[in-house]
């Protein structure tokens, strides 16, 4: 049942990318699944909910570099970032690729838990971090005893998966520069994109040199500035025009 539930999203990713070597496919799948993290308006829990669940939520502290959860391990609960930053990455050493950064208020682990999927990336603390953890039993009890929260949580999951699918479909048939511009706009938090070029290339099913060339063109036109594993948008209106 769980495998059938996630198959449409996997097929959609394959259709957009055309299928690539396993390592790049792994980065791509993890990156797009990481787009389904609960964030901002799509987060399933409100501030009042977290306060009401104080006795249920476990507080866990992580030093910089500490592993929060491992790729391929069975999802055993839901993580809510309280303080600090959590890096989501696949691979190791030189093959390692960062696919997302969790910020305070972000929620992860709920979709793999509901679908009985393993985690597809490793979460590691970038800074001193505090997370709230809701284990499987507590999560199931929460959904069973708080109908309003259960409805909002299911709506949140549906919204996140739908948004990810719409983004993927929106890439079809567009020139690569327009795809890159749109991806940067979608991924920006406070005008910053904290992803390596390899991850951006994998998400679009493109070669890294092609992405690098486009980013240099954008930088030359003063739309962005490019640093190590970070891109800053300096002209949002101009970049949005390139995405059309």
Curated annotation (Swiss-Prot):
CDD domains documented for this protein: CAP_ED
Record-annotated HTH crp-type domain positions: 174-237
Protein name: HTH-type transcriptional regulator Cmr
Any GO CC annotation of this UniProt entry: cytosol
The organism's taxonomic lineage, starting at the top: Bacteria, Bacillati, Actinomycetota, Actinomycetes, Mycobacteriales
Alphabetical list of Pfam families matching this protein: cNMP_binding, HTH_Crp_2
Role: Positively regulates the expression of at least groEL2. Cyclic AMP does not affect transcription in vitro.
Annotated a nucleoside 3',5'-cyclic phosphate binding sites: 41-160
Sorted UniProt keywords: Activator, DNA-binding, Transcription, Transcription regulation
Gene Ontology annotations of biological process type: regulation of DNA-templated transcription
Gene3D superfamilies the record matches: Jelly Rolls (2.60.120.10), Winged helix-like DNA-binding domain superfamily/Winged helix DNA-binding domain (1.10.10.10)
DNA-binding region(s), chain positions: 197-216
GO MF assignments: DNA binding; DNA-binding transcription factor activity
Keyword Transcription regulation belongs to the record: yes
PROSITE patterns: CNMP_BINDING_3, HTH_CRP_2
